[in-house]
Amino acid sequence: MDIRAPEQQYNPYRVYTREQWARLRDDTPMTLEPGEFDRLRSLHDRLDLQEVEDIYLPLSRLLSIYVDAMQRLYYAERQFLNIRDRKMPYIIGVAGSVAVGKSTTARVLQALLARWSPRPKVDLITTDGFLYPNAVLDRQGIMQKKGFPESYDLPLLLGFLSDIKAGRRHVRAPVYSHLTYDIVPNQWVEIDQPDILIVEGVNVLQTGKLPRDGKAVPVVSDFFDFSVYIDADEAALRRWYIKRFLALRDTAFTNPKSYFNRYALLSDEEATATAIAIWERTNLANLEDNILPTRPRATLILKKGPDHVVESVALRRL
């Protein structure tokens, strides 16, 4: 007789403490140099040798198992169907709230995975490039909802992922500038048949409304082979966002070309009040309505504590 609580019996995830997860590293070698951490770390995120050893090396080992299994299945299916397709990349999605540390996780994974043997080609793309230009958002009256699902050019993003998954070459994605807070006209980044593609964005696990006529309506996560959701309590996210806003006020916002240059001369009190207002009006609403509900769709959940350190890991059961 199973005497576990119902929420444990029916939990689709296996949950590991940090210590339990760290032991799963086994003999996975450390391939990053200490000097690389600053380059991989986002502003005010936490990344050190211990975090990589305890969290990211076990994850790298797990992903190597998943990628190898998918490749063997892919080749077996091709043999069964007697077809010769182009190379199909393995796509990993990284999701989570603003200020949670998605970019750091994505960059660390890219660095670790690219040093597997043999050396795979690992590319990284963010969904920021698929936001509508500011002029379009203004025209549609949704500039205050930038980052919400409706602010993305979903057909363009789905077309991009479809081309990548089909193994097409020289697939282009738009470029986004965090300085101007807008799409850069006539600039593109090219993705050319990677072995692994990491796709990072707040809403990459978002689902659409189910059609009444039964027709297939693709969503971004349909193209993912593995997905990571980075989780943290709202109070921590709010604090990290405010801290980041204050740091940007003293750095990037001082650039006259910055979209947020008007905030550069705010006092600490004014900047904090502004950051709280932006958080509550935009980021918190997006988190509660659109981002957090997608957490149960992830393959793996990294739960961070108040100091940006991962405290537990939840892995979806096969």
UniProtKB/Swiss-Prot annotation:
Task: From the Swiss-Prot or TrEMBL record, state where the protein is found.
Answer: Cytoplasm
Which family does the record assign? Answer: Belongs to the prokaryotic pantothenate kinase family.
Gene3D superfamilies (alphabetical): P-loop containing nucleotide triphosphate hydrolases
Q: Pfam families in the record, alphabetically?
A: PRK
Biological processes per GO annotation: coenzyme A biosynthetic process
Species of provenance: Bradyrhizobium diazoefficiens (strain JCM 10833 / BCRC 13528 / IAM 13628 / NBRC 14792 / USDA 110)
Can you tell me which residues bind ATP?
A: 96-103
Record key words, sorted: ATP-binding, Coenzyme A biosynthesis, Cytoplasm, Kinase, Nucleotide-binding, Transferase
**Signal sequence residues:** none
Q: Gene name?
A: coaA
First-listed, main subcellular location of the protein, grouped into a coarse class: cytoplasm
Catalytic activity entry: (R)-pantothenate + ATP = (R)-4'-phosphopantothenate + ADP + H(+)
Tree of life domain:
Bacteria
Please list the GO terms describing molecular function.
ATP binding; pantothenate kinase activity
According to UniProt, the name of this protein is: Pantothenate kinase
Enumerate the InterPro entries for this protein. Answer: P-loop_NTPase, PanK, PRK/URK
